[in-house]
Swiss-Prot record:
Gene Ontology cellular component terms for the protein in this record: cytoplasmic side of plasma membrane; ESCRT III complex; late endosome membrane; multivesicular body
Main subcellular location of this protein, as a coarse class: membrane
Designated gene of the protein: CHMP4A
Membrane topology per record: Peripheral membrane protein
Annotated InterPro entries: Snf7_fam
Protein name as catalogued: Charged multivesicular body protein 4a
Length: 222
């Protein structure tokens, strides 16, 4: 029977505990031992006080108290050692459980990675990249062909076009010269129209004024 089997009271043929069950059982046992430690410490303190109480008054009782104290201290030391062993076992199982979980996770990741690349190899990748490059070149050639100007009317005589252009330039030059000649002729001078208002009457001569004054003076004398 293994150490764990003896600890949990299981036979050889019985299935061993899972790591979680073992950890839980160890924690429960640790709690029991901790309570035992507290009890032993209290009993040791009581026996120490009893030995002090009897002292020289009752030497026999004092010695008995010290003997009991000594046995309790031995039990406490054994309990401390057992508790340390259980803590070590529990920590070892916890670490093993953690490592096992990490290992399973890494194994799953490796399987997933293997599955992702199971249909791929370097030759297929090179072939795929070559196909992509070829298709890009074809696409570029098509784009260049589409953007190239189409040569409709390439069979037209170039000299004939130049002659027609020269005729158009001559006609345009003739129109410009005619327009310039019209601008150089002086327009007819427009005469001002006769004024519509009447001119003021001219003042009477100076002689008529004198004659009128003399006539007025003669009339006054008579």
């Amino acid at each position: 029977m293994s150490g764990l089997g003896r600890l949990f009271g299981r036979g050889k043929k019985e299935k061993g505990p899972t790591p979680e069950e073992a950890i839980q059982k160890l924690k429960e046992t640790e709690k029991i031992l901790i309570k035992k430690q507290e009890f032993l410490e209290q009993k040791i303190e009581q026996e120490l006080q009893a030995a002090k109480k009897h002292g020289t008054k009752n030497k026999r009782a004092a010695l008995q108290a010290l003997r009991r104290k000594k046995r309790l201290e031995q039990q406490l030391a054994q309990t401390d050692g057992t508790l340390s062993t259980l803590e070590f076992q529990r920590e070892a199982i916890e670490n093993a459980t953690t490592n096992a979980e990490v290992l399973r996770t890494m194994e799953l990741a490796a399987q997933g990675l293997k599955k992702a690349y199971q249909d791929m190899d370097i030759d297929k990748v090179d072939e795929l990249m070559a196909d992509i490059t070829e298709q890009q070149e074809v696409a570029q050639q098509i784009s260049d062909a589409i953007s190239r100007p189409v040569g409709f009317g390439d069979d037209v005589d170039e000299d004939e076009l130049l002659e027609e252009l020269e005729e158009l330039e001559q006609e345009e030059l003739a129109r410009e010269l005619l327009h310039v000649g019209d601008e150089e002729e002086e327009p007819p001078v427009a005469l001002p129209s006769a004024p519509s208002t009447h001119l003021p009457a001219e003042p009477a001569p100076k002689a008529d004024e004198d004659e009128a004054e003399l006539k007025q003076l003669a009339e006054w004398v008579s």
